[in-house]
């Protein structure tokens, strides 16, 4: 209830009308330094400058401008940094009055609550005390438009070759969000066509040398969902051939029919995901609310997009009616509501933009009178003073709070028992999981060198994506979707202190209980018989992962900076840099420049023989206890080789240093850290307090 009041206060009673500093801090403001140089700053302003360094963001914004020129979707929801300075404090207040009104609100409640108490708080403390206003109409739908082709430049570091870094993207409106069967069918088709390198469209484009990766994403969080079909990292001279090849493959699939086994596998996996309702870092109630609002905002029933019901029975019945083939024609090939965007790499566009901004700021500063410059300095001083001033006791007293006596001193209980199964340690977490079993295998790899850790991390990228002794990569892809909810691999580091850590290669699989035997059989096959010398598949995955890591570093520079700083003084963080951080990116980058990967193949085979085995293995299972699950785990463990005990000195901290990493962005990220003694829960609690994450 306390947190609910905090959010309701923030929405309906913000201090923005009496504290202009909030607008200047969160939105934007001018600053003059001691030499008289003018700059713009602000939380949202800086965030969006960082976002516009992301080629994906620029591409999606261009698609939405082209597809929805007459609707609010043509605007960037977070604000275009070139236009954010056009927002005045007065307009900001006006927009809040107009849009953040109970008359314009939808109220969604989720969770275990006393509903009468909650409704009374909503009514008595908030809704009834605010004057009704005009309810705003939902904007009209966009009429079909066939937009002219667009070319959008994006920044590339000087050391990166521009030649093969073009992107071709198609935008296609699918229909209306309330047509759930059509939207879900397009999600299924996106997996069948481009779900991985073995999917028909990806496979043919890669084999033809027309691009490094092919992606198809259904954007369904808007009134008229659209598909983005993208060929990534293609040369300029291959843009037209790539488009022609896309069309030719899609026409062939539409004419000859979509593979029924792949359709069934994709549907089985999507149905699992929708019924599981795992929203990752989002609380489940928040994730469900997105589906509720998709329908409710547009006049539908609130639960229309949430319940799975017979949705997949209907889709399966339409498989043999030619409906999926017709969708390919109607949405991807002959769509009157479409656009094409080409992303053009540039070594100079970023610097040109920064120089243009600098000249504009110089012009603005030169146009000010002495009085205007003094006013900006006064506002800046007021903002600095506001930042430095503590909240008054009266203000602090208004914050709802819990006493320590309101919180149980006991941690939340997760049922855990330690036993043995198949001769290896077993952690069992017996709880209801909607009929789903989650099995994790932890292979000890503590002691590997940094280079070896990077190779094992990459080996995890290959598992499930290359041929095995029993199946081709294409066959394996369909089987994994058919029998598994998920199967993934990662290198995870667990730190006890600055110099004590353990590292695990983790294999995770989830499946409904009736399919867990098949799922673990596939996991066994992947772990023990994967072809780790599959040249074409490995080369493709290597390039894709290198590009993905580059984008990750640019888009999440704060995470990269924190990890890099921590690796200077803790061994575990240094290992994580090789497994998942900047050192891993450098390792991938070096390998993508090599023409002979035979050394990598040999290293992968040698490491697989060392780390994949019963020795050093711990198994974890979550779900209701089941003999069938235990039997499947035992069978898997028995198939694994003995393996070796991994030994070695591991990775040492990198040592304290000042370090900088250049990225193509208008925004930089700084991180610093240091040792704080033995780790305990106090530091974790302090971290949540200072980062405000407790508001979630």
Predicted regions and their residues:
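M16 family metallopeptidases and their MPP-like homologs
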Residues: 1-13, 19-31, 57-82, 104-110, ...
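Bacterial peptidoglycan biogenesis and beta-lactam-recognition machinery
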Residues: 13-17, 54, 115-116, 126-133, ...
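Active-site neighborhoods of enzyme catalytic cores
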Residues: 17, 24-42, 47
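Non-catalytic, conformational "gating/processing" segments within enzyme and secreted inhibitor domains
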Residues: 41, 90-125, 600-635
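His/Glu-based metal-binding/catalytic segments typifying zinc-dependent metallopeptidases
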Residues: 45, 49-53, 57, 135-198, ...
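Generic recognition of flexible, low-complexity loop/linker segments
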Residues: 93-97, 155-158, 201, 215-219, ...
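Extended, regular secondary-structure scaffolds
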Residues: 115-134, 256, 334-337, 346-382
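Extended alpha-helical coiled-coil "stalk/arm" regions that scaffold and mediate dimerization/assembly
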Residues: 322-327, 370
